[in-house]
UniProtKB/Swiss-Prot annotation:
Pathway: Amino-sugar metabolism; N-acetylneuraminate degradation; D-fructose 6-phosphate from N-acetylneuraminate: step 2/5. Homodimer. Catalyzes the phosphorylation of N-acetylmannosamine (ManNAc) to ManNAc-6-P. The keyword Zinc applies. GO terms for molecular function: ATP binding; N-acylmannosamine kinase activity; zinc ion binding. This is N-acetylmannosamine kinase. Its EC number is 2.7.1.60. GO terms for biological process: N-acetylneuraminate catabolic process. Keywords: ATP-binding, Carbohydrate metabolism, Kinase, Metal-binding, Nucleotide-binding, Transferase, Zinc. CDD domains: ASKHA_NBD_ROK_EcNanK-like (cd24069). Belongs to the ROK (NagC/XylR) family. NanK subfamily. It comes from Escherichia coli (strain 55989 / EAEC). It comes from the Bacteria. PROSITE patterns: ROK.
């Protein structure tokens, strides 16, 4: 059975056909509508899926935000603008006449990464460190989504009670410090206004402030991982995202995690999928996981 997988992100929409063999075929991409209106998103999704839907038997959506009862929510509703409560599942069912499921994109990516692991792993946590910090938890071989879709939003756990205000409304979240956006926001002086990519480049050139910002991010993530180990007793943590996979970053996280007591140590792995983990994870879940 072929799945029409869709990934809805803040800047792009992607879709592809994924067969039972897990191979991604006929991938297509469009920019996410800037207007944040239901009509614009529906039209964009229609244009994206119309060439593909005749070749699929079901639809699986991985989306930014919180998915609750098939609709789109967010920790900070202002981030969604007019898309708050957008009926993702109902919309795609109407557009395609196919059965449809929807899940948070980081949760979907966690499931894809879990399926790629070797060995007898039943408990793992996936963390993506990119513009924000998100994640997904697999416990006992099952992906945790929670009754309200919130499970795995580990970037919004507390890192520093005196830290910066996070977009979710809390103060001192991991995301506000460790994410690419958090790294850039903390930059001062000649680095003020630089994005995370530039800061990583400057760190590689020996810039002391840039190095300190990246170390702060890595140390914050290591402490989060220690907390996750204490909470879930997971067998491994998989780290992805543009920051998480940046050269030298995971080694820094490992260094800071090693400074924690031994009980909180856990194997760290780089993500298997650099791209399209959300697409693949949603399709894999549609093959047999009850959401």
């Amino acid at each position: 059975m072929t799945t029409l997988a869709i990934d809805i992100g803040g800047t792009k929409l992607a879709a592809a056909l994924i067969g039972a063999d897990g191979q991604i075929r006929d991938r297509r991409e469009l920019p996410t509508p800037a207007s944040q209106t239901p009509e614009a998103l529906r039209d964009a999704l229609s244009a994206l899926v119309s060439p593909l839907q005749a070749h699929a038997q079901r639809v699986a959506i991985a989306s930014t935000g919180i998915i609750r009862d098939g609709s789109l929510l967010a920790l900070n509703p202002h981030n969604l603008g007019g898309l708050l409560h957008f009926p993702l599942v109902k919309t795609l069912e109407q557009l395609t006449n196919l059965p449809t499921i929807a899940i948070n994109d980081a949760q979907a990516a966690a499931w894809a990464e879990y399926q790629a692991l070797e060995g007898d792993i039943t408990d793992m946590v996936f963390i993506t460190v990119s513009t924000g910090v998100g994640g997904g938890v697999v416990s006992g071989g099952k992906l945790l989504t929670g009754p309200g879709g919130l499970a795995g939003h580990i970037g919004h756990t507390l890192a520093d009670p005196h830290g910066p205000v996070c977009g979710c409304g809390r103060t001192g979240c991991v995301e506000a410090i460790a994410s690419g956006r958090g790294i850039a926001a903390a930059a001062q002086g000649e680095l003020a206004g630089a994005d995370a990519r530039t800061i990583f480049t400057r760190a590689g050139q020996g810039d002391e402030q840039a190095q300190q910002l990246i170390h702060l991010s890595a140390r914050t993530l290591a402490r989060l991982i220690a907390d996750i180990k204490a909470t879930t007793d997971c067998q491994c943590v998989v780290v992805g995202g543009s920051v998480g996979l940046a050269e030298g970053y995971l080694a820094l996280v490992e260094m800071y995690l090693a400074q924690e007591p031994a009980a909180f140590h856990v194997d760290l792995l780089a993500a298997h999928y650099r791209h399209d983990a959300g697409l693949l994870g949603a399709a894999l879940l549609a093959q047999g996981e009850k959401l």
